[in-house]
A protein has these predicted regions:
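Flexible, low-complexity segments enriched for small/polar residues
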Residues: 40-67, 75-218
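Loop/turn elements at helix/coil->beta-strand transitions in domains of secreted/extracellular proteins
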Residues: 35-37, 69-72
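Non-catalytic, conformational "gating/processing" segments within enzyme and secreted inhibitor domains
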Residues: 1-52
Length: 218
């Protein structure tokens, strides 16, 4: 912080002019009629779906949020709402979520240079967002270019990781074993068909599995 750059004059916010401190600023913003819907909708898109909630779901979670702006109640309402519990594959995992998930699942030894290079290529370096609004979400992470980068990284990680739980089972059981290893409970018929040619190549099988729709979304 550079004190001489601080502007200590009064500011006008939503028609109110004063020297706002942090608490007054937040109170003024949260007093706006649409603030509850905005906050609830943004948290929904962080936790439940890349798409906004339906008007019905939004009404339920805003009601839980209440006039007291209870974030714990709002979070609980989202995670127990029927549109959340009944949904599947509605949130695209960010590059950081994807990469950390693969590294943890395969127990890959630390490889800082590879991690940094992969996240830089995928466009999500920690602490370097493109703007103060953070990184985008949703389909933007599923571009053709990012698919190539993910596959390249996945092959490296698969060769460096622990695949003993895959290699130790019969070839016919390996797709289920991969699902158990990376946390995918069920595969679509189309995905199974795509993975079957790789049954005798565990590293390639795992690399392909972590690039399927079932793993890239949650």
């Amino acid at each position: 912080m550079i004190p001489k750059r601080h502007d200590g004059s009064a500011k006008t916010l939503f028609g109110l002019t004063r020297n706002f401190d942090a608490a007054e600023f937040c109170d003024t913003v949260l007093a706006q009629p649409k603030s509850a819907e905005y906050v609830a909708g943004r948290l929904w898109q962080q936790l439940a779906s890349d798409d906004p909630p339906s008007p019905q779901a939004l009404g339920r979670i805003v009601s839980a949020y209440g006039t007291g702006r209870d974030l714990r109640a709002l979070t609980q309402a989202i995670l127990t709402d029927e549109e959340f519990t009944g949904g599947r594959a509605t949130v695209v995992n960010t590059p950081i979520e994807w990469l950390v998930g693969v590294i943890r699942a395969l127990r890959v030894p630390a490889q800082p240079k590879m991690v940094h290079a992969t996240l830089r290529t995928l466009g999500q370096r920690p602490f370097y967002p493109p703007s103060v609004g953070g990184w985008p979400s949703g389909q933007v992470w599923l571009s053709t270019a990012s698919a190539g980068a993910r596959l390249h990284a996945a092959i490296q990680l698969a060769h460096a990781g622990d695949l003993s739980s895959i290699e130790s089972v019969a070839a016919g059981d390996r797709i289920d074993a991969v699902g158990y290893l990376i946390g995918v409970g069920a595969w679509s018929d189309r995905t199974v068909e795509a993975l079957e040619p790789l049954l005798h190549q565990p590293p390639q099988l795992v690399a392909a599995a972590v690039n399927t729709p079932e793993y890239l979304t949650s």
